[in-house]
Amino acid sequence: MREYKAIFICILICNVFVCPKSFGQTDYTYEKGKSFKNTNALSMTDTIDLTSISSPIPYKKSIPGQTQTIACPVRLLGYVRGIFFSRDSRPGDFEWPNNTNRLLPWVFNDLKELTDTRYPGIPSNAAPSTLGDALLLELTNGEYLFAKAIAGRNSLSWLQVNDNGSVTLYVSTLGKDYLKPEVPLLLIRQGKDIYSTIRQAYQALMKNTEAADLKSRTAKEYFEAFRYLGWCTWEHYHDDINESKVINDMKTIEASGIPIRYVLIDDGHLAHKNRQLTDFIPDKQRFPSGWKKIMSYKKENKIKWIGLWYSLSGYWMGLSPENGFPQVVRQALYPHAGSLLPGTDSTRIRSFYRYYVSTLKEQGFDFLKVDNQAFTLPLYMGGHESIRQATDCNRSLEAETHRQNMGLMNCMAQNVINTDHTSYSNSTRVSIDYKKYDEDMAKSHLFQSYTNTLLLGQTVWPDHDMFHSCDTVCGTLMARSKAISGGPVYLSDAPRDFIKENIFPLIDEQGKLFRPEAPAVPMPESILTNPLWSGKAYRVAAPSGNGAMTLICYNLNVSPRHQQVQAIIKKRRLFSSEQF
């Protein structure tokens, strides 16, 4: 049996610290284009030394009073190569911690490559953000190291890659509050096997109720509808939907002979003003009958379930002051940075989400796709208890959808607060949106989806996004990845355009998906490579049951020099069942 050990971080806390410059409170109010790189912080003299031994979740103690943010230099072990997980970054755009669906795997041999303008990166995305949430290293001794940022009760850590390739760990309240004297720093694990190293790190995280509210994927129920084929309005209509379009498409779906069992109504139905939600009823001009007519098309053996899209904070920019909520709900809201938000205490936040979920359930919906989750923290930033309140939003949504037996798809939920608080839900998007006819983006999508599943797949089934079966460029590519993902599979073609050859291999006669025992992940030789530029085949695998596995060898290279690659498969034992 292989032995695995936790990396320990021995942090000797002194009463001496270095403040690089005198500064007042930092304004952490979030704005598009605002970066928190090299943010004002109290520089701690003690290095986080990854060569020493301690617990998988070390704490920093004796933090001086009236400190918003600390910065801790990190001493890395010798490494051969690795992956830094962060969003992409472009001037004037959203930045960390609004990771949306854009937590991307940036592969390197030396961390300073990520700060080089010549870094080849990932096609269809901008340059790597040097502020990120996780780090995976292959060490010179042949072992693997996994480190991940975590949240405390009102603190959040993140990793910053500096121009010289060094790493600094920051911990902050991201608001007007000061850090407690003791805060968790990060999650860390070292081991001989890359899969077990990551899995054991998450097992340690699940035991720490201050840093997370998590259960493993295998310990949670999987919502019944997601075991079947679905259809979503988004990629076909985007937000240009209305009552007649949805009803006509449901009729066409039923007549198509394809057993689609649920419909997901995406963005475009909400009542809002300036992208702030005004009520949990649909736009009256687009949906004059509310949801009653659409719900009448549910049938036990046809379209059995209907789901609805909303944002965690209401709509893209939160809740409107000009709303139609009952007075008791209004009392659970407060103004901050131009929006109304649930809060300020946990009881009020929970009462808002109780109303949120119950209102939509009463209207006939079976599950929710809750989007824009990573932007909830930015909406609270710059205020008091920003992290605690944003975390309470995720906790409350989880608790209420579970209590009211509503299914939940998580989307744009790739910051630490979102990923580490899926106590009941069992599906999260692992990638940027799929785009029709865009082969390079499809390749990037697959690379991100499979690599992120190494992390997120510990606690949820990965959602690889919807796809068009009629996509003549990427349709078959997408169909295969959905099949092996184990997560929800939902089409977004105009129903008249369905291509049965890309659909029927995924399902039985009742529309039930053929699913693997665990989600597909990259095989060992493919994990720490960038398959878009490697010149090699990219291999992923998932256990299929009875000791068998499903394997796909991709050519994801985008260079014309590698239009063909060779892959050799030999019959041998590739994985133990525990590795999945």
Over which residues does each language-model region extend?
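Short helix/loop capping segments that flank catalytic or ligand/cofactor-binding pockets
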Residues: 239-242, 273, 419, 492-494, ...
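Short glycine/proline-enriched loop/turn "hinge" motifs that connect secondary-structure elements
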Residues: 219-225, 542-544
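Extended substrate-binding grooves/exosites of carbohydrate-active enzymes
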Residues: 502-515
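Carbohydrate-binding surface patches
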Residues: 482-485, 490, 529-579
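Bacterial Sec-dependent N-terminal signal peptides
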Residues: 1-26
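Glycan-recognition surfaces
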Residues: 316-361, 395-500, 517-532
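Aromatic-lined carbohydrate-binding/catalytic grooves of carbohydrate-active enzymes
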Residues: 224-387
